[in-house]
Amino acid sequence: MEDVTLHIVERPYSGFPDASSEGPEPTQGEARATEEPSGTGSDELIKSDQVNGVLVLSLLDKIIGAVDQIQLTQAQLEERQAEMEGAVQSIQGELSKLGKAHATTSNTVSKLLEKVRKVSVNVKTVRGSLERQAGQIKKLEVNEAELLRRRNFKVMIYQDEVKLPAKLSVSKSLKESEALPEKEGDELGEGERPEDDTAAIELSSDEAVEVEEVIEESRAERIKRSGLRRVDDFKKAFSKEKMEKTKVRTRENLEKTRLKTKENLEKTRHTLEKRMNKLGTRLVPVERREKLKTSRDKLRKSFTPDHVVYARSKTAVYKVPPFTFHVKKIREGEVEVLKATEMVEVGPEDDEVGAERGEATDLLRGSSPDVHTLLEITEESDAVLVDKSDSD
């Protein structure tokens, strides 16, 4: 507010000479009337003027005091308004930080959800492939059961008809016997190979006919043996042992695929759990969790009045300058039994698990305060509570 200047204008009185000079000239009757009053009238006028002056001065003092008070209140209001502006600015800064944190968390959550969707799609595809494999295995088992039930295999072997000549000369038969490969010679039994001594001996017509019959018989036996071998091969291919081996192989392959899928699912689950734990530690810090845990324990104790009270003694130090007070609180109760820790050998798998846990604890330690500072804070708060109770 601006300073207001007050101008006091005094009204002229009829008794003063200023009034006679400024006003109109009085008549002769009025002049006589003015000349008539004695010294008593002039004294009364002076007293009334003094009283009016004192009143005006007191009013001026009051007005000046009110103006000063208004100025003081205005200055206090300006200071409060400046403090309010600072508080509003700090609140706006914290709100902007909170918005940024929420944006980052929403981005991480959206990325996690996308990864979870991809994992679910992969799991669905793996399940579909496993179901298809199971259907194929069932079909194979059904076909195998039908084949084992039948156990009768009819194999048709088609061969070109070889027209053998009615008569063969000994020279041709000898040439053919010499031209036979060693492999075919191994297949032939005893008595099938023609004797080498016949080349040197001249044979008669009866002996030539006998040699031709022996050659024809050897060829027929060879064809029979090759057919029997093929039938044996087919039987071996569709035998019980081979079918059982194929069953065992298919089962082993199925078990391997199932184990691989289980391992992959467990790995994905572990990775998701790790990421969710990291996100949880980011959203809810360790201090907050400890506070929630202690509050839960206190609530449980409050609802269970018969809980065990352990004996303890605490020393709290608090300073009231220029004094320092050491307060020792002793609580009676049962002696707390500390659990003994056992040393356990750690293997390579435990080392991996310990490394993962160490990473998690390192992340937690980065944001958690020291234990000593927490204990000092609790002791100071307990000391303040004791002071308040003593003062009450």
UniProtKB/Swiss-Prot annotation:
Keywords: Acetylation, Cell membrane, Coiled coil, Cytoplasm, Endoplasmic reticulum, Isopeptide bond, Membrane, Microsome, Mitochondrion, Nucleus, Phosphoprotein, Repeat, RNA-binding, rRNA-binding, Transcription, Transcription regulation, Transcription termination, Ubl conjugation. Residues 201-284 form a coiled coil. This is Caveolae-associated protein 1. It comes from Mus musculus (Mouse). Residues 1-45, 173-197, 347-367 are annotated as: Disordered. The gene is Cavin1. Phosphorylated. Present in active and inactive forms. Changes in phosphorylation pattern may alter activity. Phosphorylation at Tyr-158 is essential for its function in the regulation of the ribosomal transcriptional activity. Monoubiquitinated. It is found in: Membrane, Caveola; Cell membrane; Microsome; Endoplasmic reticulum. Its main location: membrane. GO terms for cellular component: caveola; cytoplasm; cytosol; endoplasmic reticulum; mitochondrion; nucleus; protein-containing complex. Residues 138-154, 235-251 are annotated as: Nuclear localization signal. Residues 168-188 are annotated as: Leucine-zipper 2. Residues 55-77 are annotated as: Leucine-zipper 1. Changing residue 391 to A: Loss of phosphorylation.
